[in-house]
């Protein structure tokens, strides 16, 4: 005989609950109680309810990010796809070859796993901020990379991400979150690619099919399980424009930039009193950063949307 577990309401009698009984009848519920049981939440229906809530929160979070001026926005789930794991291994090879120059912080172990930055992290909201403005420096003037024309983007992106995080806390009081800009040890471009914001080009910058590579990125880690967007796929093809244009041959091979040869590194991060001779010879008018590899990218030669964000508009200097 099989064990039949009776409904407590059916067996309730004068404050007593009968023990479960064995019997030959496999149907232990009356028709009425079977109908009631059919109405009870099943695991599948409960999962569907949770999934609906997850979907609504995911979409609302992206809308909230758009309200802060971010476009594109996307979501990735931790630990990420196999391709992201390959990006993590590529970071180690890059470090092993010394391409980080003296940027020792690039080797921080936390860079390999967002869960080391936020305990219990489940999802990553990735955001992009377009800083393209159709303006050119005066002929003969010194040059600053476009991302430096406006206000310090670290502060701009961080402040906006924190507002989004506080909004998320209002929706989910028990959730944890952390705002990350590129000063945080996170594989930021790899996670942006994972969230569908664009693909990592051969010059190592993120490229969006409609906005090109003129955008800075940020991330909001959260313990909330959110719906992931499809990862972006590379559209660089056989193009080698950025590799060919680099005056110091810093792009040693597709997707591999040697900071020791990069003008941007030497004008921003290098703290030595003297620059290497090959760097001095190639500097030209560049005094802060370098945009050569992006200037020649075909994806930046399209009709790109200009940013009207007041924080990225060129300032006199």
Regions found by a protein language model. Give the residues of each.
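Short, small-residue-biased leader/transition segments that mark boundaries at the very start
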Residues: 1-5
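Intrinsically disordered, low-complexity, charge-rich segments with an acidic bias
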Residues: 6-40
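Auxiliary alpha/beta "docking" domains used to position bulky ligands
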Residues: 46-235, 285
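Iron-sulfur cluster-binding cysteine motifs and their immediate structural context
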Residues: 70, 241-271, 283-311
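A short small-residue
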Residues: 143-145, 268-274
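SIR2/sirtuin NAD+-dependent deacylase catalytic core
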Residues: 238
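Short linker/helix segments within small regulatory modules
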Residues: 274-281
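Short, intrinsically disordered, charge-balanced linker/junction segments flanking boundaries
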Residues: 314-317
């Amino acid at each position: 005989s099989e064990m039949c577990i009776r409904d407590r309401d059916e067996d309730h009698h004068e404050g007593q609950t009968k023990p479960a009984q064995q019997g030959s009848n496999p149907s232990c519920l009356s028709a009425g109680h079977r109908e009631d049981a059919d109405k009870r939440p099943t695991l599948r229906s409960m999962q569907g309810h949770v999934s609906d809530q997850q979907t609504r929160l995911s979409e609302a979070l992206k809308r909230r990010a758009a309200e802060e001026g971010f476009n594109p926005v996307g979501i990735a789930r931790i630990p990420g796809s196999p391709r992201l794991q390959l990006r993590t291994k590529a970071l180690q090879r890059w470090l092993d070859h010394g391409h980080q120059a003296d940027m020792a912080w690039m080797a921080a172990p936390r860079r390999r796993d967002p869960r080391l930055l936020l305990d219990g992290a489940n999802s990553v909201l990735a955001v992009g901020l377009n800083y393209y403005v159709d303006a050119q420096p005066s002929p003969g003037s010194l040059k600053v990379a476009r991302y430096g024309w406006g206000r310090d983007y670290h502060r701009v992106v961080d402040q906006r991400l924190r507002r989004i995080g506080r909004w998320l806390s209002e929706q989910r009081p028990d959730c944890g979150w952390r705002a990350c800009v590129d000063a945080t040890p996170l594989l930021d471009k790899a996670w942006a690619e994972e969230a569908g914001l664009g693909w990592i080009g051969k010059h190592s910058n993120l490229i969006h099919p409609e906005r090109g590579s003129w955008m800075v990125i940020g991330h909001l880690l959260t313990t909330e399980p959110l719906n992931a967007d499809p990862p972006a796929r590379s559209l660089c093809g056989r193009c080698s424009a950025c590799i060919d244009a680099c005056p110091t041959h810093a792009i040693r091979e597709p997707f591999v930039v040697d900071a020791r040869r990069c003008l941007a590194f030497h004008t921003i991060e290098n703290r030595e009193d003297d620059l290497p001779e090959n760097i001095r010879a190639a500097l030209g008018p560049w005094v802060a950063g370098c945009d050569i590899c992006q200037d020649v990218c075909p994806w930046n030669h399209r009709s790109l949307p200009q940013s009207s964000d007041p924080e990225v508009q060129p300032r006199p200097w």
